[in-house]
Amino acid sequence: MLSVVKPLQEFGKLDKCLSRYGTRFEFNNEKQVIFSSDVNSEDTFVILEGVISLRREENVLIGITQAPYIMGLADGLMKNDIPYKLISEGNCTGYHLPAKQTITLIEQNQLWRDAFYWLAWQNRILELRDVQLIGHNSYEQIRATLLSMIDWNEELRSRTERSP
């Protein structure tokens, strides 16, 4: 199975810079829409704790990940018109701030390398997902998905609740 390590050191630098400007949120053991591109498409979201799912229109599951996670890091540079929702899958804490402010702060604090590293990691994760799914039969796709779930924490793996 292909695996790529989340760039936690770079996340830490970005979080340290951005956190003092963000609006905090916390959800306790509930599924909640954290981000919806039709409501707050011009914000950067930083997830500090919890598990989140990324969904496309009609509730199509794109992926599930554990904190820490940053969504919308590049939205201050390039508008994204694809309808996405980020949903908490239980306890979740984090913050959000305007994407343009995120870019300004990255520029002021010379964190382009860290931002690039984070975005490169996200791109690689999506690339690996595509490699596992595109051009493979259903058995191979299910097998690849189950193998990727090995890296999830026990709480996430044991969840049997269906998504909204």
Q: What do these predicted regions represent?
A:
Residues 101-141:
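A small-molecule sensor/coupling module
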